[in-house]
Amino acid sequence: VMGQNVFDLAYYNLIGGLSNEVFMAIPMFIFMGYICERAGLVERLFDSLKTVVGNLYIVVIIIAVLISLATGVVGASVTLLGIMAAPHMMRLGYNPKLTAGVIAGGGSMIMIPPSVPLIVMAPTMNLNIIDLYAGVLVPGLMIAAMYMIYCSFYPRPKSDEKPQYGRVLIDVLPLTFLIAMVLGSMLFGLATSTEAASFGAFGAIILALLNGRLSLRESLLKTCDTTSVVMLLALASMIFGAVFTSLGGDTVIVDALNSLPIPSWALVGCILVLCHLLGWPFEWPVVVLVFLPIFLPVLVANNVDMLWFAVCLAIVIQTTYLTPPVALTSYYLKQVVPEWDLGMIFKSMIPFMWIQILAIVILFLAPGIATWFPNYLKIDNSTVINKIEGEISFPQFENMIKEK
């Protein structure tokens, strides 16, 4: 029925996809995340920050953002926050429900770079990974700020600990150094995503050595496990995409969705809702690698800005980690804090799920939030490149070329 051409197309899709250098960054970022998880950097920062900020709800959100900026692995973030913050906050008398929600909501912020799902999403949508990282950075920080505003309305126990400003400065430097190496080098055009991931992995090893908590063997084994799952799904999705396209499945989907009597923004909303529902039974690699390519022709036909849509989709995928009854974040948290009831954890995540949905609505109303920073970086980097090209130009060769 399919013919030899289908298998030829599947083969070429497979080779072309795996030869994309963006995928080479995946194991490095995962490895960096597992090294950081065991290095003890975050625990030290939490111990010093709690004396300065006072409100541990806010401290957990700040730490969650820093973990996301340094690692981008959901399981590691939630597990680390649960082990580190939950017992201390319960001992001080913080609200258990809000504590669980803050840890789950903060730990699920996988869209903040360097994010492994974004690395996979960029080539799937034919986007530049640097543009995508820049696009999600501002909305990600916006969501973190919305979390803080929500938590600030709740009362908190008073703390008698004296602020340790000097210790905070010392403890924040290692993570700041790592984030600057990874994120700064990419956003300002100093390194590709693969090079930045390599620098980040090397930097994480150095910091773990300095902290005396390097667990290289365990980190390598976990990196191999996680990377194998992601890459296996990538291989399967490429073959599926080739067969699906050859059989005309994409045409059927495009025609069906385009025939709906609704405006393009509503069509995009329907696609995001479908992706959210698919995120319940499936992990994010399946949604991004298998189902997203099916919807791409519809988005192209309706002239949807792919960068803006990718940012919205990243938040949607992030929201699935907080949506009962399949919210994976709740099971990560239950594993490290077994005394918390699973039903209570589910209820605690719902306000943070609605905050993320509100962020998507804001992006629909003000799409420039997702696009202005990538555009700014393009202008800034192009100015630098033009200046460099002007300084190293060779007018005699340019004249020879013009004469010819």
Outline where the language-model segments fall.
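Alpha-helical transmembrane segments of multi-pass membrane transport proteins
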Residues: 1-404
